[in-house]
Amino acid sequence: MQNVKLISHPLIEHKLTILRDKNTQPFQFRMLVDEISYLMIFEATRNLKVKDVKVQTPVALADAKRLTTKVMICPILRAALGMLDSVFTIIPDASVGFLGFQRNEETAQAEFFYAKLPKDAKERMAIIIDPMFATGGTAIDAVKFLREKGVKEIKFISIIAAPEGLKRFSEIYPDVEVYTASIDEKLNEKNYIVPGLGDAGDRVFNTL
């Protein structure tokens, strides 16, 4: 799975350990999701396009670079909202395209219920964010939706992922890069990531 990029960094590993802990309180969980996302976005945006420009410093004229890639952040509602602020901190000029999927507890499949994209979505590189990448179903449906809307370049950032979901996704979209901080052991019989971190949405929004 050459499209899967495992981001390894001591700070991320340390914060992920606290994130997994069942005793971590919601306010701290939200903070950790934000901090880990902040660290991960650097790697996912490594290949953004830039152009050569001149900038006048207080001392002299300097050769410099300016971003030319227009970015659209696509959080998967609702858990990914906890990742959004950190991405905005790094890319304040990004647009946001909301994608709503809800897990059906009987089928363990994600059901689409909402989307709101900027008018120029097809001119932007989409970065889909979702803290958990389990079966891959939501990711597949999200990419399919964006492709149907004309979005050509897409990346996916997830804090933890299951190998089954990554394999399934990569077979369908080998050209879409997935960045994750951890590839966990497996999915259980309910399609929850093991060892995982529980329900990210419930822990972010304190709805346990």
Swiss-Prot record:
Allosterically activated by GTP. The keyword Nucleotide-binding applies. It comes from the Bacteria. Binds 1 Mg(2+) ion per subunit. The magnesium is bound as Mg-PRPP. This is Uracil phosphoribosyltransferase. Its EC number is 2.4.2.9. Its cofactor is Mg(2+). Disulfide bonds: none annotated. It is an enzyme of class 2 (transferase). CDD domains: PRTases_typeI. GO terms for biological process: UMP salvage; uracil salvage. InterPro entries: PRibTrfase_dom (IPR000836), PRTase-like (IPR029057), Upp_B (IPR034332), UPRTase/APRTase (IPR050054), Ura_phspho_trans (IPR005765). 5-phospho-alpha-D-ribose 1-diphosphate binds at residues 78, 103, 130-138, 199. The keyword Oxidoreductase does not apply. Keywords: Allosteric enzyme, Glycosyltransferase, GTP-binding, Magnesium, Nucleotide-binding, Transferase. Catalyzes the conversion of uracil and 5-phospho-alpha-D-ribose 1-diphosphate (PRPP) to UMP and diphosphate. HAMAP family: Upp_B. Belongs to the UPRTase family. It comes from Campylobacter concisus (strain 13826). Uracil binds at residues 193, 198-200. Pathway: Pyrimidine metabolism; UMP biosynthesis via salvage pathway; UMP from uracil: step 1/1. It catalyses: UMP + diphosphate = 5-phospho-alpha-D-ribose 1-diphosphate + uracil. One of its GO terms (molecular function) is GTP binding.
